[in-house]
Design a protein with these regions (language model features):
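A short glycine-rich, His/Asp/Glu-containing loop-to-beta-strand
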Residues: 1-25
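His/acidic/aromatic-lined binding-pocket segments of jelly-roll/cupin-type domains
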Residues: 12-13, 32-37, 68, 78
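Short beta-strand His + acidic residue motifs that chelate non-heme Fe in jelly-roll/DSBH
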Residues: 23-24, 44-46, 68-70, 76-81, ...
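Glycine- and acidic-residue-biased ligand/ion/polar-headgroup-sensing regions
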Residues: 30-50
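Short acidic-glycine-tyrosine-enriched beta hairpin
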Residues: 34, 48-73
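Double-stranded beta-helix
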Residues: 52-53, 58, 75-127
Length: 127
């Protein structure tokens, strides 16, 4: 997108194994989000309000699974499974940074490196 206030925000996100994107939701403001995997392999997790995994989807172009749609207000997160993974993210605009209440309180903050490592290991075992 050309401007942060465009009605649709689109971005390419290049991710490597070990990248931590804290589980979050898009509730305030409510926004659906779409991930299209262009290359690599990524696990997409959906969670309930307690942090329990309710759904796991492996995005893998080699298997013909290219995308996931996340409904507004749904807790979600990713685990990068293959080096060189690139996703195309599409979300309603205008861009708004995530408010603190949109980060999952049951997930470790990025600066908690030990907690993040343990959490990512748990996600990996859930696949």
């Amino acid at each position: 997108h050309e401007h942060l206030d465009d009605p649709v925000n689109r971005l390419l996100n290049a991710l490597e194994p070990g990248t931590y994107l804290r589980p979050h939701r898009h509730l305030n403001p409510k926004k659906d989000e779409i991930f299209l995997l262009l290359r690599g392999r990524i696990a997409v997790f959906l969670f309930d309000n307690k942090g329990e995994i309710t759904q796991t989807q492996i995005l893998d172009p080699k298997e013909g699974v290219y995308g996931a749609e996340i409904k507004a207000g749904t807790w979600h997160g990713l685990l990068v499974l293959e080096s060189g993974s690139v996703i195309y993210e599409i979300k309603e605009g205008p861009f708004a940074p995530l408010a603190p209440e949109n980060f999952a309180p049951w997930s470790p903050a990025p600066e908690d490196t030990k907690g993040v490592a343990k959490y990512m290991e748990l996600l990996g075992k859930a696949i």
